[in-house]
């Protein structure tokens, strides 16, 4: 098994329900034991090993992995999920923007990226990454968001290095619901380490480190 995981996602790829884990090196696959109904380590995927801080999987099976320091990778696995079939490295989302780190998130089922200057999204139909105008027009100041946590289908926490921001989705637009600056806490979060755990009853717990 792969130790030191930085992100874990339950997803379906090629019709198989699995847990994917990425860490500072391999991409690992976990499957559900049919007897115990518990997740167990299956294998490490061949063909990809890198410093990954977060990732998301889109509806078509693309794995979008954010490098710890620069760019993102788009991966597609073979049918047996044991090796990488396609790999594309994307160093920047727009010409002239050399921000380095690109964050990857999922918002209302859509893959969303941020690079500190804009939000972008992946268009399944065209296979292209384009500016996400819905957020850029109303909340350009949130373009340094590094994590999005879903409270429910219409409420989302945007996590920045200075605050937690709650946005609601109403009538086709995002609306500001609440801002919680880190200065309210005795021990401010470590950079890029803030997170939120949402319990089954909808309570949000703020993780500072």
Locate predicted features:
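Carboxylate-rich, polar loop motifs that coordinate divalent cations or form catalytic acidic clusters
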Residues: 1-209
């Amino acid at each position: 098994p792969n130790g030191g995981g930085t992100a874990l996602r339950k997803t379906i790829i090629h019709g198989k329900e699995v847990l994917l884990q990425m860490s500072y090196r391999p991409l690992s696959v976990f499957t559900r034991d049919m007897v115990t109904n518990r997740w167990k380590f299956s294998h490490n995927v061949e063909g990809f090993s890198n410093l990954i801080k977060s990732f998301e999987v889109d509806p078509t099976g693309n794995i979008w992995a954010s490098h710890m320091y620069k760019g993102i990778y788009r991966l597609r696995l073979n049918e047996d999920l044991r090796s990488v079939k396609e790999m594309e490295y994307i160093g920047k989302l727009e010409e002239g923007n050399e921000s380095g780190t690109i964050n990857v998130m999922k918002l209302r089922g859509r893959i969303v990226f941020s690079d500190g200057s804009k939000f972008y999204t992946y268009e399944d139909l065209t296979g292209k990454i384009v500016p996400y105008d819905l957020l850029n027009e109303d909340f350009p100041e949130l373009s340094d968001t590094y994590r999005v946590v879903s409270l429910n289908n219409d409420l989302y926490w945007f996590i920045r290095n200075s605050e937690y921001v709650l946005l609601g989705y109403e009538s086709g637009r995002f609306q500001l619901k609440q801002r919680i600056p880190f200065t309210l806490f005795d021990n401010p979060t470590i950079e890029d380490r803030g997170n939120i755990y949402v319990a089954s009853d909808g309570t949000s717990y703020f993780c500072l480190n």
